[in-house]
Amino acid sequence: MNLALHTLSLAGSETLNDGFAATLLAGGCQLVDVRSPDDFMRDALPGALNLPVEVLSYDFRHLDKHEPVIVYGAHPVACVRAARLLAGQGFSRIYHLAFLRM
């Protein structure tokens, strides 16, 4: 599985360089898995929090607004929706992770 990290903006997303993505994934970020609890239990990324979009819309207290957040899940639309919810709550460094299957 290949990974691509994108930054969210209202205009779209931008692919980040591999070095920056590696730095974030190595521990300088908060990982939010927006999939169902069952999917999360099956194969979550290490250190990720399970906050499905339905939960994230009212409960984001486990996240620090001052730290970068990477949102990932099975569906890009859910990731973008979650990222926009976080942006609306004052989070500014929000990224979404795209899983590219080859």
Where are these regions (language model features)?
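Short loop/helix-cap segments at secondary-structure boundaries that form the rim of catalytic
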Residues: 40-46, 60-63
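Conserved small-residue
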Residues: 32-33, 48, 86
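Catalytic cysteine-centered active loop of the rhodanese-like fold, especially the PTP/DSP P-loop
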Residues: 60-102
